[in-house]
């Protein structure tokens, strides 16, 4: 649980010239007495491509902090234009207002800042060299991005490593995306299982068809064998009959009959 809660920030001189100081009225609540001061700091992001151009505009120690709701005015100098890449001086950038306790940052507020020329002529036809005196800034104060960090306070035992390093404001969205991805994966696995079952059923059907076909082939083979055996038996019977007929014919030619042979 955070001992210090940020209640509100009001951006005072906005819009303003690029060379004007920054002014913020900050309201926060302290739930318990603090042993150390709070450190507030304002950082200007000079380039979106490198951290080397970031400038710490100012920092202030607030303390001792009484329990309850507190309010103070924070002023910071403007950034040095010579430390900002010329291609990014007249553009959109970010300022970061952060607060730390015992060198541990627990809240950070980011604002978009739009830097542009103060006349339509310069905006349509910007000079080759940036004219800083004609550049104005506009802080999008109505759309701050707040990030909170869990730290160990005076009344808490333990190590800071036991706490998650930070809690992003988009944590819920990331969890929803992860849940959606898991659901998609489960659906894909179910589809694969269904396809696998259908494939197995198809294979079983093919095997059954093959077994049935083989069975019918074997049955037809057995029928053919039986027919061949019957034909052979019929042929043998016909041959025996022909032989008997031939013998009877021979005996008839000799004038003998089976009866005559018996009598003689």
Curated annotation (Swiss-Prot):
Coiled coil regions, renumbered to chain: 165-198, 231-251
Gene3D superfamilies per record: Histone chaperone ASF1-like (2.60.40.1490)
Major site of localization recorded for this protein: nucleus
Subcellular location, record wording: Nucleus
Residue stretches of biased makeup (Acidic residues): 154-213, 223-248
Pfam family, one: ASF1_hist_chap
SUPFAM superfamilies linked to this entry: ASF1-like
Keyword Membrane: no
Gene Ontology biological process terms, A to Z: cellular response to stress; DNA replication-dependent chromatin assembly; nucleosome assembly; nucleosome disassembly; positive regulation of transcription elongation by RNA polymerase II; protein modification process; silent mating-type cassette heterochromatin formation; subtelomeric heterochromatin formation
Quaternary state and interactors: Interacts with histone H3 and histone H4.
Name of this protein: Histone chaperone ASF1
Taxon lineage: Eukaryota, Fungi, Dikarya, Ascomycota, Saccharomycotina
Gene: ASF1
């Amino acid at each position: 649980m955070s001992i210090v809660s940020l209640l509100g920030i009001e951006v005072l001189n906005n819009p303003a010239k690029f060379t004007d100081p920054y002014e913020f009225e900050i309201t926060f609540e302290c739930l318990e007495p603090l042993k150390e001061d709070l450190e507030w700091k304002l950082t200007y992001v000079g380039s979106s491509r490198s951290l080397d151009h970031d400038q710490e505009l100012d920092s202030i120690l607030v303390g001792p902090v009484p329990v309850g709701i507190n309010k103070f005015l924070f002023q910071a100098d403007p950034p040095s234009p010579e430390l900002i890449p010329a291609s990014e001086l007249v553009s959109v950038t970010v300022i970061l207002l952060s607060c730390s306790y015992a060198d541990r940052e627990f809240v950070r507020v980011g604002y978009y800042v739009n830097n542009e020329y103060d006349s339509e002529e310069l905006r349509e036809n910007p000079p080759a060299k940036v004219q800083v005196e004609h550049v104005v800034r506009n802080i999008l104060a109505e759309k701050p991005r707040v990030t909170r960090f869990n730290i160990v306070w005076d009344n808490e035992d333990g190590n800071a490593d036991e706490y998650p390093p930070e809690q992003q404001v988009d944590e819920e969205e990331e969890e929803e995306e992860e849940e959606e991805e898991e659901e998609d994966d489960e659906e894909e696995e179910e589809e694969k299982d269904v396809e696998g079952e259908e494939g197995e059923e198809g294979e079983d059907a093919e095997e059954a068809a093959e077994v049935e076909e083989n069975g019918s082939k074997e049955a037809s083979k057995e029928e053919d064998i039986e027919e061949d055996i019957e034909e052979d038996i019929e042929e043998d019977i016909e041959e025996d009959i022909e032989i008997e007929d031939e013998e009877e014919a021979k005996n008839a030619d000799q004038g003998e009959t089976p009866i005559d042979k018996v009598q003689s």
